[in-house]
């Protein structure tokens, strides 16, 4: 996974012709962060047939992006063809929101905006209005799974971030002796208002990753309780 470095990109090509020209601001549909300023509406852009992404032509339209680099991805397309995508993420929550075919953003002809990733309405005023992020998923049987990144040996138990990829939780206990798991379960029980018997902790995809499976709450309820508990 490439290291993500945050940048603010802008393209002054095809700037509006005067002070009365319309500008459209688009926000991340998940967290409400500002992502794109352009002089055309999203619904008027052509769509790719392969993934239904909106195609923004930088040669004819303004494209001011506020994103971070998400790395290069190779995708298999039909007839053995490979497609190269240089992905860009929302700065606020790191959700994949758009991509380009060329490595250099300034010389790229087109920006492809992921279908459904952006909104003309900012959700910043009320984060609870944002969609439930992918790290909190509804499972069969009424269960909800939460992807957690655990930081051990912290000063105290706390939730410090909720984004698309995971919920970051700090615990005071060291991870090596397994004490961190017990502290994590007890803390999450207090945050979610659940008993230990209503939660199961599973291994994730690396040493810091955990998967918490909970009962008797919906994904939306879990998300809202976690948001309320986040500390700066």
Curated annotation (Swiss-Prot):
Origin superkingdom: Eukaryota
Stored SUPFAM superfamilies: YggU-like (SSF69786)
Disruption phenotype: No visible phenotype.
Any GO CC annotation of this UniProt entry: spliceosomal complex
Gene3D superfamilies: YggU-like (3.30.1200.10)
UniProt main location, coarse: nucleus
Any one Gene Ontology BP term: mRNA processing
Keywords in alphabetical order: mRNA processing, mRNA splicing, Nucleus, Spliceosome
Keyword Endoplasmic reticulum tagged: no
Subcellular location: Nucleus speckle
Signal peptide: none
Sequence similarity: Belongs to the UPF0235 family.
Quaternary structure note: Interacts with CTN.
Functional summary from the UniProt entry: May play a role during early embryonic development. Probably involved in pre-mRNA splicing.
Protein name per the record: UPF0235 protein At5g63440
């Amino acid at each position: 996974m490439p290291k993500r470095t945050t940048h603010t990109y802008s393209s002054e090509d095809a700037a509006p012709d005067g002070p009365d020209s319309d500008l459209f601001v688009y926000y991340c549909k998940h967290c409400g962060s500002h992502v794109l300023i352009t002089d055309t509406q999203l619904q008027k852009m052509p769509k790719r047939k392969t993934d239904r992404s909106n195609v923004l032509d930088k040669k004819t339209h303004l494209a001011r992006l506020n994103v971070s680099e998400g790395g290069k991805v190779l995708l298999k397309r039909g007839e053995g063809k490979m497609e190269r995508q240089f992905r860009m993420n929302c700065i606020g929550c790191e959700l994949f929101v758009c991509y380009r075919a060329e490595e250099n953003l300034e010389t790229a002809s087109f920006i492809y905006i992921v279908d459904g990733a952006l909104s003309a309405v900012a959700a910043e005023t009320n984060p609870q209005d944002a969609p439930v992020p992918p790290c909190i998923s509804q499972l069969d049987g009424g269960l909800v799974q939460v992807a957690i990144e655990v930081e051990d040996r912290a000063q105290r138990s706390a939730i410090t971030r909720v984004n698309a990829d995971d919920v970051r939780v700090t615990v005071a206990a060291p991870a090596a002796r397994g004490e961190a798991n017990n502290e994590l379960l007890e803390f999450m029980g207090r945050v979610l208002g659940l008993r230990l018997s209503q939660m199961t902790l599973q291994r994730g995809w690396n040493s810091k990753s955990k998967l918490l499976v909970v009962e008797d709450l919906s994904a939306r309820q879990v998300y809202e309780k976690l948001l309320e508990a986040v500390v700066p």
